Structures are given as structure tokens and as C-alpha cells.
């Protein structure tokens, strides 16, 4: 037998017998294809035998050979397809088509072109069969007329073939190594290698085209021998299906017994829906009893040989009973509603046909049922819809509802648009209402802030800006008031407490920059010199400042704490409104002991008594220059800041600046009556002749003008 499989002559004989008769021998063709698929012959030898048979001059033999080749292509396996798609076979077909001597028969030519086209269409996407497509496109370009194309799936060329044999040094089941005594054997079903003990069974493999018993291993034998029981159960289930209502002859998968229950359920639902659609009335539908369904439910039961089928049927029957109960309840409720509506007055009865295009519950249920059936039919065999006339009737009844459904859909869309417009209007109204509430709330906050802010003096602020002098004239009137006994400005100073200004300046963002006067002092001093000549006597101080040639003069000098004109303006702004206001709570602050540098010696005795003695401990360096100024009342004021800037050490000046910054950043700034008289009150006296409303407090420093000039001449 091995020689019969190895030689090609028996195959040639079979091919001759298959192609010799005028009629096609389908059985012999399938036998040859099974022989090729089972690898009983080499695929290349089979291809060459067919090629030699095609060279026969008889057109009938050529047609029979082409049909045999097509059968082998569809059932011979992948290994034979590779040989058919080789250049050796395809070029032979092309040479037959282009034969110049004796022309090819038209029938043979048409069949050959049709087969080439079908093979090329089925082999699309497979690289190992790409030459089929190339040959097909080449013939198209050369002008050969192919028949019309037909939809061919790639599964046409798929066929089961024996697997390729796998080599190994040990048994792939018991892991025993092979030796001279322990020979290796291949399983024809899986292709693995086993020893004699693990592969002693033999079985025919018809699914691979092997009809003779061949060697298989124990695992494949167990799998293949267990199939007949499954096949028997499948046969029983197929008989059960044949006895059912469907009478379907189409082969179904293994899970068909579960799908059969769904088919019966769908069939019952179809019958119920059709009867309801036929028997429906204006007052709704009334479900009628269906005694004919009982035989349909009881017929499959005798044929159920398994418990699973019985359980499935019981579940289906329970679901059907529940469905019937729900439908009866719904019908009773619908009857009650319709009877109640009919017993009402005529206007109420006339309002019922208000919406004639509204779908009834029966129509809605039929539409949903039809959609469900269509979805399930997609997974059924193609001929199922033709065997179910009830589906066609349901389709026709639903098709008549299409205009009604379109009108109902249009009305629903119009209602939707109306509701959207109303929603937009409501959103606009709510937005306007929120805006109105926000405006009211903001106005309430503004009124609340007006009651607590420095509003009464706000009108006086614009009048103060043009009269701001330089920083050098800031403290000199205070010094003159002390030296020359002009106490007219000092009494209101404790009541005003101008040092409450730094917190306000800090709110406006001025304190941080006012603590560093040397950056703006050179520019602000000359800018206010002309005004200072006309108002008071600050020019000598400016000259003294210029003569010092120190970019950072002694901060301990009273005239240099607020040197920049840009920072004096806010001081003036907040100073005058507080002249008329009672500032008594700002006086007793203990912060005055920290930064009043010139209180102990440079001021009258009354303010000194009000302050604690801690001030003298903190500013001893400042008390001495103040004493010198009190003793030298006839000296010019221009020499005072220069003297402090020269004689005070740089460390003391830095300490004084730090103390000034701390006092300006503190929350109090309230207890500086004496320090403020040294800085702000006299400074306001220099400027007040032009802009300040209270003239009494600021016109007094004008008296010592000649004295200052005389003292400058004496210096």
C-alpha cells in the first residue's frame, strides 16, 4: 500500500477514469480530492497529472479535467492550493489560452477564464496564493473577456487537511526518549510524535479525507471516539426539531436546542400580535383565549429526552403565563379607563380624538415586536424569513402605520422645539433676576461702606495736591514753633494725631515706599523750592541738604522722615479730614513710646508729661540734638538737619529708619501726638496758606520767616 501511495500512476489512472466519460463522475472526483487532501499522494505529482491531462486535444476531456481541478482546489487542502497557484500550473493555463496553432475551444476557454477568476477572487489577501491574482490581472490587461464576477468567499478554498508532522526527541505524551527499540510514530490527526505505547490506536479520519484507519495517539482517540455520542444527541435533537412546528431542514449548530425555545416563543408572540391586530377595536384590544397553543406546547414534550429541554420548556411556559397575566391586567385597566371616559360629559368625550395620530398600545407593541424579530432573523439561516408568512403579515400591518408614525413623530418634535424655546426664555429670565439681585447686593455693600469710611472729608482731598511742599519744610515749622514759642499749632496736634496716617497710607500702598526717602529726595526737593520761597522758609533747609552732599542724610533729622513729595501728599490728604474729627481714641496708644524721637527735649513740657519715659531710653541720640536746638533758638533751622546728619552715627540713623518703618507698619500709629507735631502739623502749616481750610493752624509758621533768613545770614 505504501507503494500505491508513493507512485503517481494509480492517481493517473483515477484521473483518466474521472475525465474519460462524457458525464462528470462526482464521486470519483471527491475520492481523488480526498486522496490529495490526506496527503496520500504528493500535491506536486497530482498537479502535474492534471496538467498533463489538460494537454489533451479533446475538448470534453479538457472540460472534465478543469472541473476535477476545481473540485480538488476546493477540497484538496492548502498544500495542493500552493501547487495550483504556482507558476508551473498557471503559466500552462495561460499558454493554452494563447495557443496560436490550433485555437482553443470556446467552451474550454470560457470555463478556464471563469475558474481563474473564481480562484483569484477567493485567494484575495493570501500571500501564498498571490500569483493567482497576478495572472488574473495580467489576462485582464491583455484583453481577455472574463464572465461577470460573482461574490465568492475565501472560505471556499478552506478545507481541513492533515497537519504537518512535528519532530521531537521524546514522546510528547509520556516524555520517554526515543531509541533504537522505542520507535517514534506520528499521529495523523494532530501531527505530534509519540512512542508505540501512546499511539497504538487506529481510526479513520473522514474529516481529513482519510478513509482508511490510521495511527492516532490516545488523546486524539479519546476525543474522536467520544464524538459519536454527541452526534447521536445531535441527531435526537434534529428529530425533535423536525417534529416541531418549524419543520426546518437546515442544519443548525449544537446550541440549536436552546434557540428552538426562542423560536417557539417568537412564533407564539407573532400569532398573538397578529390576532390582536386583527381583533382590535376602538376601545382597545381584548386578548382572546388561544386553545390552539396548548397542542403546540405539548407536542415537543414527548420528544424531550434530556432534563435540560424539560427545564427550558418549563421556563418558557412560565414566562408566557406571566406575559398573559400582564396583558390581561393591562386590558382590564384599559377597559376601565375607556368606560370611565365614555361615561363623562360630551366635551370630555369630544376631547378624546384630540390627537388622532397617536399610536395605540397595540401598534406600539407590534412595532417593538417586529424590530425584535428583525434583529433575531439576522442570526438565523437565510431562508427563515421565507418560511414565516406571519412575519410578512406583521410587516404589512406595520407598513400601514408609517404615515401615522411620521405624523406622531413630527408632532413630538414640534413639542420638543416649543419646550426648548420655553427653557431658553426661562433661562434668560433667571439670568436677569440674578443680575438684579447682584446689583442690589452691590449697592447695599457700597452704602454700608460709605457709613464707615472717611467720606465727609473726601471733598477736601483735591484741594490739597497743588500745595504740597518739599520734605525739607516738613518739620521746620514744628521746630520753629518750639524754638520761638509758637504753640498755636501744637495744641491741635495731639487732638488730630497725624500719625494715624501711616495705616491709611499702608492701605493705599504708600507706606512701603515712604520709608525710603533718599531715592526721591533729590528730585522732590528742587521741585518744591519755588513754592517754598513764597510760602515759608524751607529753602535754607534745601540748601543745607544740598550742601551735605549725602545721598542718604541722617534719618534721625525731623525734616527727613518724609522727604518725598509723592508721599507727603497722602499725608496731607489724610491729615486735614481728621482735623475736624474727634481723634481721641488714637492718643493713648502705647506705640508713641517707640518712635517719638524728638519729644523729650524739642517740645513743650505738657506733651512730654503725657508720654511715658520709655521714649527717652529709646532715643537718647535724638534728645541731644533736640536740646541743642532748644538752646540755640536763634540759629537757622537749616543747620539742624545737617548737624544731625553729620553727628549722628550711621548705625543710629539706620536704627531710626527701622523704628520709623515699624511704627508705620504697626496697627496703632495712634499715640504720636508729639512726633506728629514735629513732622506733620508744622508741615501742614507750611502748606496751609494755599489749600488747607483751617488757616489758624497753618498760618502761624509764617511769622518766623525773617528770623530764619537772619539766622542764615549769621551762619
UniProtKB/Swiss-Prot annotation:
GO CC terms, sorted: endosome membrane; ESCRT-0 complex
Feature: compositional bias, Low complexity: 291-302, 650-662, 697-706
SMART domains tied to this protein: FYVE (SM00064), UIM (SM00726), VHS (SM00288)
One Pfam family cited in the UniProt record for this chain: FYVE
InterPro entries: ENTH_VHS (IPR008942), HGS/VPS27 (IPR017073), UIM_dom (IPR003903), VHS_dom (IPR002014), Vps27_GAT-like (IPR049425), Znf_FYVE (IPR000306), Znf_FYVE-rel (IPR017455), Znf_FYVE_PHD (IPR011011)
Location of this chain's protein in the cell: Endosome membrane
Residue intervals of the VHS domain: 16-147
Molecular function, one GO term: phosphatidylinositol-3-phosphate binding
One BP term from GO: protein transport to vacuole involved in ubiquitin-dependent protein catabolic process via the multivesicular body sorting pathway
Topological relation to the membrane, as annotated: Peripheral membrane protein
Entry keyword annotation includes Metal-binding: yes
Zinc finger residue ranges, FYVE-type: 165-225
Domain UIM: 261-280, 307-326
Keywords, comma-separated and alphabetical: Endosome, Membrane, Metal-binding, Repeat, Zinc, Zinc-finger
Bias-annotated ranges (Polar residues): 510-551, 589-609, 627-647, 663-680
Similarity section: Belongs to the VPS27 family.
Function: Component of the ESCRT-0 complex which is the sorting receptor for ubiquitinated cargo proteins at the multivesicular body (MVB) and recruits ESCRT-I to the MVB outer membrane.
Domain-related comment: The FYVE domain is involved in the binding to phosphatidylinositol 3-phosphate (PtdIns(3)P) which is required for the association to endosomal membranes.
Subunit structure: Component of the ESCRT-0 complex composed of HSE1 and VPS27.
Protein name: Vacuolar protein sorting-associated protein 27
Organism: Emericella nidulans (strain FGSC A4 / ATCC 38163 / CBS 112.46 / NRRL 194 / M139) (Aspergillus nidulans)
Gene label: vps27
